[in-house]
Amino acid sequence: MATFSQKPAEVEKKWILIDAEGLVVGRLASIIAMRLRGKHKATFTPHVDDGDNVIVINADKIVLTGKKYEDKVYYWHTGYAGGIKERTARQIIEGRFPERVVEKAVERMVPRGPLGRRQMKNLRVYAGSNHPHEAQQPVVLDVAKLNKKNVRSA
């Protein structure tokens, strides 16, 4: 019997809605990355984008464990000499785009390459509880019930 290899035309993508309120960032990101890659499916094929579309709401209400809220630093470079920039997780979460903490965590758990970039386009993260994807009829995934460690009361 030959190894099963799914073709891109055979892929069935579902829409999944996750409420991130009170969830631990790393645990949430690992579940999202698994769903984006399609590793939760029996038809997983490493070189095919067979993951689901994931919508994350309330990304501004995520929780970091330990002292990471104050101490975790995100670095980036502008491209100019001496252009290294840094922000703490607190500055990002309390700033204009709090959803970037979740996006970065997931981005670093997905493979770096053309397939990983395509899979990241299937992730939509929103700071509030509103999202424009009601027409897709997303299925709600309760991450808090998967494991008691996924939730941390602030």
Swiss-Prot record:
TM ranges: none
Listed CDD domains: Ribosomal_L13
Keyword Kinase appears in the UniProt entry: no
SUPFAM superfamilies xref list: Ribosomal protein L13
Gene Ontology MF: a single term: mRNA binding
Gene Ontology annotations of biological process type: negative regulation of translation; translation
Signal sequence region: none
NCBIfam families: rplM_bact
Function of the molecule: This protein is one of the early assembly proteins of the 50S ribosomal subunit, although it is not seen to bind rRNA by itself. It is important during the early stages of 50S assembly.
Protein family: Belongs to the universal ribosomal protein uL13 family.
Protein name according to UniProt: Large ribosomal subunit protein uL13
Organism ancestry: Bacteria, Pseudomonadati, Pseudomonadota, Alphaproteobacteria, Hyphomicrobiales
Gene: rplM
